[in-house]
């Protein structure tokens, strides 16, 4: 189980402290990163890719992405792309699917359990989803003009 945290707010001390309340969900490593004014945190329990390459968020010039999940058909989905993925993480394929097929089709293609946040850096748009059953929890809250999304309610 990993912990993910996102907010459209800057990385203020209170925001960082909130994100760190999820650290028990990822005992292997933690990462905090601001991308285009959006704050991402990831607490990792390494399962599929034990190397540092599997650390999130995954960030390119097109997206930033964090995910707590297990994508059972990730190897088959990776074959849809002629790119070199930076890791062996089963979640890394998801943002590429979103960019190519859109969120609705991507969700129908995924086999597994997941909760994620995707920042489209081109359109400055946030997309977030979880598996239909809700095996991987995901909570969202707003305050004024700020959006926050986390693996556990206590981080909000």
Give each language-model segment a name:
Residues 1-156:
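Cysteine-centered catalytic environments shared across enzyme families
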């Amino acid at each position: 189980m990993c912990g993910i945290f996102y907010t459209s707010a800057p990385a203020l001390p209170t925001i960082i402290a909130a994100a760190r309340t999820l650290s028990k969900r990822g005992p292997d490593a933690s990462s905090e990163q601001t991308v285009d004014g959006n704050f991402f945190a990831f607490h990792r329990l390494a399962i599929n890719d034990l190397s540092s390459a599997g650390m999130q968020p995954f960030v390119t010039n097109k997206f930033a992405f964090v995910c707590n999940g297990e994508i059972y058909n990730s190897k088959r989905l990776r074959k849809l792309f002629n790119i070199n993925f930076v890791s062996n993480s089963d979640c890394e394929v998801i943002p590429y699917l979103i960019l190519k097929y859109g969120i609705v089709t991507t969700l129908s293609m995924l086999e597994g359990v997941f909760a994620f946040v995707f920042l489209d850096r081109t359109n400055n748009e946030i997309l977030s989803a979880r598996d239909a059953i809700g095996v991987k929890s995901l909570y969202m809250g707003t305050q004024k003009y700020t959006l926050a999304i986390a693996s556990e309610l206590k981080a909000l």
